[in-house]
């Protein structure tokens, strides 16, 4: 069984901190990130098995209430995403580089999963909203044809 990632964006930093705390106490999940982002929002990303992430997200949504801006669960996420989100990816060789910018931080994670599953590319980094005006971007490497295929898959799926 693969891992899942749960993403929650709030428009209150104190409520975001409370939600993150309750989410990790509610289920056996790893907290990948929980931090303020631009413009004045808070993003929480957890990973774990499908059931744990679902339980954790349900608690997060309850705590967030009307402060919730967006949420998403990606089941069976590509194995490279957690390290790319944490910014700790190690690769042996960087070939061609692909960069995709998204309108929101949460959609950058979804785009990364699509790209990594669509072509033989290695995720280098997924940056989520910090210092980006709420946007996100991902950087990956691979052969030219693979990078182009990954970019095309994201464009076709997400628009």
What label would you give each PLM region?
Residues 12-13, 36-39, 49-51, 76-78, ...:
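Short, ordered loop/turn segments at secondary-structure junctions
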Residues 104-110, 114:
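C-terminal low-complexity, charged extensions that often adopt amphipathic alpha-helices
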Residues 57, 63-97, 108:
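Ordered, amphipathic secondary-structure segments that act as subunit-interaction surfaces
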Residues 1-2, 24, 34-38, 65, ...:
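Solvent-exposed alpha-helices and their adjacent loops that cap or buttress functional pockets
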Residues 27-30, 44, 100, 117-159:
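C-terminal binding/interaction regions
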Residues 1-40, 44-47, 51, 109:
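The feature marks the first
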Residues 1-11, 90-103:
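Short glycine-/aliphatic-rich beta-strand segments at the starts of folded cytosolic domains
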Residues 31-34, 38-77:
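Acidic (E/D-rich), amphipathic helical modules within compact regulatory domains
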């Amino acid at each position: 069984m693969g891992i899942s990632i749960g993403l929650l964006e709030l428009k209150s930093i104190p409520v975001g901190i409370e939600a993150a705390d309750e989410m990790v106490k509610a289920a056996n999940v790893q907290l990948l990130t929980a931090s303020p982002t631009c413009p004045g929002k808070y993003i929480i990303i957890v990973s774990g098995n499908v059931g744990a992430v679902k339980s954790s997200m349900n608690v997060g949504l309850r705590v967030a209430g009307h402060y919730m801006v967006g949420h998403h669960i990606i089941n069976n996420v590509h194995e490279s995403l957690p390290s790319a989100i944490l910014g700790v990816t190690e690769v042996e060789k960087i070939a061609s580089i692909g960069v995709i910018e998204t309108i929101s931080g949460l959609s950058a994670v979804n785009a990364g999963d699509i790209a990594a599953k669509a072509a033989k590319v290695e995720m280098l980094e997924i940056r989520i909203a910090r210092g980006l005006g709420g946007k996100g971007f991902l950087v990956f490497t691979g052969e030219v044809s693979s990078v182009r295929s990954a970019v095309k898959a994201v464009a076709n799926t997400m628009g």
